[in-house]
């Protein structure tokens, strides 16, 4: 079986990598359509286990962050806690946690454990700035982004994964982030 990354990039290439990049650079809200389109196509090709969905969401988020040139740090360890994504950077997280987001991508059905939650809140005390991506909704003291089809009802604590890039962009705008961005 092909790897999740290979399947993802074949879908992206079918749609048009440059087309996606140009379109979401001009209008970030269009990323919702592309993310949902990619998840739907992926769904037709691969069994959607929690692990597969987690791997897809992780790779797709990395692609979209790069495409939109949003500042991020990926796969870091702080205080013995592995973090998947930090927005915008580690300096901001350390010195101004209210201006930083931690995104954890869960690859099982359990969400994050109480110990993990406790450790993350030591690093990021603002629970609204802890975003957890899962296949289906899970409960916890954080914002939960789900890739589940039909999750159209968004609240402040439960969001659809296809909204994540728009929400990151809005967060950076709200916090007046001026991190250096590469433009293609």
Predicted regions and their residues:
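Short secondary-structure capping micro-motifs at structural edges
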Residues: 48-49, 70-74, 86-93, 116-120
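Charged, structured surface patches that assemble and position nucleic-acid processing machinery
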Residues: 105-184
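Charged/polar, solvent-exposed surface patches and flexible loops
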Residues: 6-13, 40, 44, 63, ...
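A short acidic/basic microdomain associated with nuclease active sites
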Residues: 51, 62-84
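A broad, low-specificity signal for short, low-complexity segments enriched in glycine/proline
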Residues: 33-35, 45-50, 62-67, 90-94
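Interdomain/boundary linker segments immediately adjacent to catalytic/signaling cores
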Residues: 1-56
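Conserved catalytic cores of phosphodiester-cleaving nucleases, focusing on short active-site segments
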Residues: 65, 83-116
């Amino acid at each position: 079986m092909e790897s999740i990354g290979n399947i993802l990039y074949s879908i992206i290439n079918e749609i048009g990598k440059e087309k996606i990049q140009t379109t979401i650079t001009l209008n970030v809200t269009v990323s919702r359509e592309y993310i949902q389109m990619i998840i739907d196509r992926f769904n037709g090709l691969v069994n959607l286990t929690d692990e597969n969905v987690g791997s897809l969401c992780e790779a797709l988020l990395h692609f979209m962050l790069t495409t939109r040139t949003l500042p991020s740090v990926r796969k870091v360890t702080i205080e013995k806690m592995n973090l998947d994504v930090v927005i915008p950077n580690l300096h901001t997280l350390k010195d101004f946690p209210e201006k930083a987001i931690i995104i954890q991508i869960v690859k099982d059905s359990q969400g994050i454990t109480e110990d993990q939650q406790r450790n993350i809140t030591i690093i990021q005390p603002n629970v609204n700035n802890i975003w957890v991506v899962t296949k289906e909704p899970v409960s916890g003291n954080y914002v939960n982004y789900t890739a589940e089809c039909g999750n159209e009802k968004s609240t402040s604590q439960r969001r659809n994964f296809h909204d994540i890039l728009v929400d990151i962009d809005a967060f950076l705008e709200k916090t007046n982030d001026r991190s250096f961005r590469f433009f293609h």
